[in-house]
């Protein structure tokens, strides 16, 4: 049976207490711009409490690199992508851009401009890491938007499962230092992986805890 540990608080503070190479795979979606619907039905960018970066990105990356033994995948905004990519490009290992191509992109101002139908992530595998179960697979993942929308930037469940299956084996530890509403944790328990999650916002932490506990009780 999968095990899980959840922390409510600042991820940088908790990361500093974790041992080197103590998790196998870090899969996270760091805070960045989300969207809000205006009175005329169009959608505009906004920054809500759950979407604002509250920590130093380079400090965060150094800590994530330190605690992860195998591979890392970080979803991010376009403004953050080059910083994250360049950070890992200067480490020993292999870095790749990951593209989530949404099969049902949101029509945000689509009558005026091209739809924003993709999200980006940076994937990194440490030098000497052994686990990779996606042989000869490319870096484009095609899945629809997440449906439950418990969090403004929630990821598709099947997308998260696919990344977890690609980068871990059963019983491995998956880590999400910005877990939001707990989607990564749910995907871990559904694939027999162990999970460690951190969330700063109390509202989303409680949602994540309830979701993960519900799945854990069903899989006993």
Q: Whereabouts are the PLM-identified features?
A:
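Positively charged, low-complexity nucleic-acid-binding target-recognition regions
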Residues: 1-3, 212-220
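Short alpha-helix adjacent to the SAM-binding motif of class I
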Residues: 203-214
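Core catalytic lobe of class I
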Residues: 2-196, 205-206
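Conserved acidic E/D residue at the C-terminus of a beta-strand in Rossmann-like folds
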Residues: 199-200
């Amino acid at each position: 049976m999968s095990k899980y540990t959840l922390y409510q608080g600042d991820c940088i503070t908790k990361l500093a207490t974790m041992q080197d190479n103590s998790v196998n795979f870090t899969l996270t979606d760091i805070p960045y711009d989300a969207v809000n619907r205006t009175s005329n039905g169009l959608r505009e960018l906004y920054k809500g409490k759950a979407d604002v970066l509250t920590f130093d990105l380079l400090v965060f990356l150094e800590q994530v690199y330190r605690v992860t033994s195998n591979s890392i995948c970080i979803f991010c905004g376009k403004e953050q992508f080059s910083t994250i990519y360049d950070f890992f490009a200067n480490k020993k290992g292999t870095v790749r851009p990951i593209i989530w191509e949404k099969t049902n992109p949101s029509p945000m101002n689509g009558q005026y401009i091209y739809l924003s139908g993709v999200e980006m992530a940076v994937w990194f595998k440490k030098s000497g890491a052994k686990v990779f179960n996606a042989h000869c697979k490319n870096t484009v993942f095609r899945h629809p938007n997440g449906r439950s929308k418990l969090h403004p930037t929630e990821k598709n469940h099947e997308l998260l499962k696919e990344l977890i299956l690609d980068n871990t084996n059963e019983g491995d530890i998956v880590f999400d230092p910005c877990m939001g509403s707990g989607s990564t944790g749910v995907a871990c328990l559904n694939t027999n992986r162990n999970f460690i999650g951190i969330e700063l916002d109390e509202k989303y932490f409680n949602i994540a805890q309830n979701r993960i506990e519900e799945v854990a009780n069903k899989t006993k």
